[in-house]
Each structure stands twice: as C-alpha cells, then as structure tokens.
Amino acid sequence: MKLPIKGFGKVISDDKGILSIHYSNFSESKENKNSFKIEGENITTELVEDAPIEDIPTAFLKLHLISHRHFKPNALNMDNIFNVLETIAWTNQGPMRPEVAEKLVDGTSNLKIFSLDKFPPMTDYIIPSNVRIADTSRVRLGAYLGKGTTIMHEGFVNYNAGTEGPNMIEGRISAGVFVNKNSDLGGGSSTMGTLSGGNKEVISIGERCLLGANAGIGISLGNDCTVEAGL
C-alpha cells in the first residue's frame, strides 16, 4: 500500500474531543491534502502527504497502517505524535480521561484500568495473523509484527518498531527498532530506540542474530551476529 490513503473507522469521543479511533478499512484517497471528517461515530481520514502529525485522526491512522503491516517501521513520518496524543485511561469500560476514571475508582467498582498511556494495546484494535503474544498489554498500537513472531511474557514492542518474522522476542524492542527474520531477543535484553535520551540513530538487527539474556545494544547489527548474555 502507498499514499495517498483514505481510512474509514469508528471514533469514540467525549465533550473534550477524540479518545480513540478504530480504522477498519483503507482505500486510495482522491483528495489533495490531509484532512478528516467526522459524522456521528464514523470518521474518514485522508492521508495524502506524509508530514509530521498534526491531529489525532492522522496519528491513529498511521499507527493502524503499521500494525496492519501496510507500512514497516520508519516508513511513515511519526514526528510530533507525542504532542498530539493525550494520556488516556484504557479500561474494561472503554477509553476515558484519567480524571473521569479517578472518580469511578473507589475500591469496589468493576472498573479495571489496563494502562494510563498515550498508546493503547495493539490487540484492542488489530490481531495480526500468525503471531503469538503472551501478554498483549506489552505490545503497543503501532507495532509491526511479521508472520511467525512470538512475543513472550517479558517481551515488549513499542510503536513504530517490530519484527519481520519469524522471531522469538523475550526482550524489549524500542521505538524505531526493526528486527529482521530468524533473529531472537533473549529475556531482559534491550535495544536503544529513537526515544532513548535524544538518540536519533535508527537501530536494526539483521537476520539470524541472537541478543542474549540481559544484553543491550545501541548500534545496529548485521546478519549472523551474537551478543552474549549480560553484555
């Protein structure tokens, strides 16, 4: 899939604005600029120019496009997404403002808050084919999981990051990091992403690599590399 793209979906809003958007259909856009239109609970978003993100509909559309495997990490401009998205309480009763959730939590309510975050869990919106995820709260919307990927309980995948598949992930894949096929991350291992301390270097791991348990890297790896445990 390539730009320009039109996304169709359902929006959840409150009196302060948009809380969440679930895009379920994509087609070619005929418009000449980025825009969105909301009619009731339906939303249509036009992504024509891949510019820094300026609104919530565009942010959610780009996150969906990556998790649907239409674009790989770093293929879309995700600049400014943190300034656009708001912190939301992701709960068993749907998304809500943290201040609203606070009023409902009294120790006896049935409200369960899964996270307070700008990004919801990916599987609330998208279930990619041929993957396993042991703890779905540890994969953010905007993660790219290729076929044959397994994310174990201690594995984590940030938005705009992911795996080509097949891969076994027991460590952390930070924003901007991409792991190529047949490479594995051991338990507790870390990859330094583009959100780490002002780091601008895009990190990738080549094919048939092993990042040992509790190891960490801040540089890219080529094919057939092994980083011993604890390094």
Regions found by a protein language model. Give the residues of each.
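Terminal amphipathic alpha-helical/low-complexity segments used for targeting or macromolecular assembly
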Residues: M1-I127
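A structural motif detector for beta-strand N-caps
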Residues: V131, S137-V139, A143-L145, T149-I151, ...
